[in-house]
Amino acid sequence: MGAYHSEFRRSIESRDEFWLDAARAIDWSTMPTRGLDDSNPPLYRWFPDGELNTAFNALDRHVDGGRGDQPALIWDSAVTDAKRTYSYRELRDEVARFAGGLASLGVEKGDRVIIYMPMVPEAVIAMLACARLGAVHSVVFGGFAPRELAARIDDARPTLIIAASCGIEPTRIVEYQPIVDQALTMTTHQPGRIVMLQRDAKPAPLGPRYLEWAELMADAKPVDPVPVKATDPLYILYTSGTTGRPKGVVRDAGGHAVALTYSMNAVYDIHSGDVWWTASDVGWVVGHSYICYAPLLIGATSVMYEGKPVGTPDAGAFWRVIAESGARALFTAPTALRAIKRVDPDGKEIAKYDLSAFRTLFMAGERLDPDTLGWARDKLGVPVIDHWWQTETGWPIAANPRGLEPMTVKPGSATVPVPGWDVRILDPEGAELPPGRQGAIAITLPLPPGSLPTLWNDDQRYVAEYLSRYDGYYLTGDGGYRDEDGYLYVMGRTDDVINVAGHRLSTGEMEAVLAAHPAVAECAVIGVPDELKGQLARGLVVLKAGVDIDEETLRAELVDAVRREIGPVAAFRDVDIVAGLPKTRSGKILRKTLRGIAEGRDEPVPSTIEDPGVLDQLRPVLQAH
């Protein structure tokens, strides 16, 4: 039996012993003696008698251990042509002072703080400063519109907001301050203060409740880390639900630190002193786990990149960053590689840079098509490793465990379940399916450390949405199968969440925006395949009777409304006006059927359809793109 199989078996059969062993890699103020707390199923908790501080583990212990001069964070901004490297000592000192500044504004253990910032080092400093105080951060992606920000403010009820004056895109500057101000006109909760990082590209005019970052830091005194219970929340990260208010995924402090530390070694084969680059955004879970926390927890150097794969300035941007930073590995989404491949199909830009330190390319966030995998492998000459996880899980469910036992790559597969994740493929009745049969991907409870213990202030919704479909299992919402070798193939979402360039977005929320237009009687939004972004949202709208409006005008208004309400991240550009939508006799729109037709499948007509003739009218529209 190989290293992977023995480790996986131990993680399932001797769960407590396995994770208490893993917990020894962390410095605890109170070392846990218990692994799993199963006193309140299905709400399981990890390390219930442990206490720690995540920021201490990410910074202070490395300084105390004699590695204070090692680079901790390399910031590379292609959009401002700026760079900055922070040593572990410098980053620790900045975080300790900013935490002191937050404390002077009344932030205490357990308080929530919303962070609305682009890819600047101050975003990581703000996250770690919250962790140092035992406060709970909730980072909101800087591309989200006022309505999305407002919903998160009302759910998290933050003591204060930390923002930047702007984000910088290749062709424009996105001002954040007007978005924050507009969001606060929509909320019932009003945070006391807003700390604003002024960026040279576009400083913001500040009202009375604003305080400049530099002003706060000028008088700030450093504070020591505050120990918290392992089961206390470290952060809340909101994810797209299919309906209703946003879901606040909770990450607890102890399980998070243990699981991320384990993953860096077992999954990514990255260790103290290595340079690691995750090309994502701190507003997403990948940025939380693998830009901010995991690399610092193990004493690696984390690269933080503000820019794009192409256009800042060219398709060689990623290879320049790898060459200049000495990154051993890159973790990004397939969308980024598809964008580079489209502009530089022959890989000429790759040849311009010294990539001798580069060992592995990791991909996740959406399906990695075999064509993109093959192109990257052939042009870069390194293993290209697909893996799969979710906002909810916080770290990989299935991967090629490079630090345990590197396995053969099978294009289209995320390889095998990571130790701790007991993955099953279930039929609609909950029976386990044999190899080769596709079904719902579920995970046997309890979930391992680092995954969500619940949703913010909503145990009931957590149980209803994730744990109620199959008794004793967490439902991932993805479908797939395993082959005879145990490799997992993830085939896509089984709900109405789509994946645009690695970003999970709710089609239901987009439909709500379209339906609000006075000319629209009903609508549907589906995800359709896109060569560059993986999926794109496609809108279908039926007009109200008697409405007289120019179709192009309506299209422009609907696209603008989605951009305004959801944000540019929705990449919503495609909407058709149609005579009707296919429905069941009970009135449910047949979105799965629409998706199948749009993807060119010979979709069977459901027996429950009310009017099969509607599909005949829609086929040419759906297949025209």
PLM region spans:
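Structural core segment of the AMP-binding/adenylate-forming
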Residues: 128, 132-215, 326, 333-334
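Conserved pre-ATP/AMP-binding loop-to-beta segment of ANL
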Residues: 69-71, 194-197, 207-238, 245, ...
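Conserved AMP-binding/adenylate-forming core of the ANL superfamily
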Residues: 55, 73-128, 145-150, 209-215, ...
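AMP-binding/adenylate-forming catalytic domain of the ANL superfamily
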Residues: 192, 196-198, 532, 564-589, ...
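Gly/Ser/Thr-rich phosphate-binding loop
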Residues: 300, 328-331, 341-408, 422, ...
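AMP-binding/adenylate-forming catalytic core of the ANL superfamily
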Residues: 140-165, 180, 323, 330, ...
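Conserved AMP-binding/adenylation subdomain of ANL enzymes
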Residues: 257-275, 285-329, 342-348
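Conserved ATP/PPi-binding loop(s) of AMP-dependent carboxylate-activating enzymes
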Residues: 416-420, 431-466, 505, 602-603
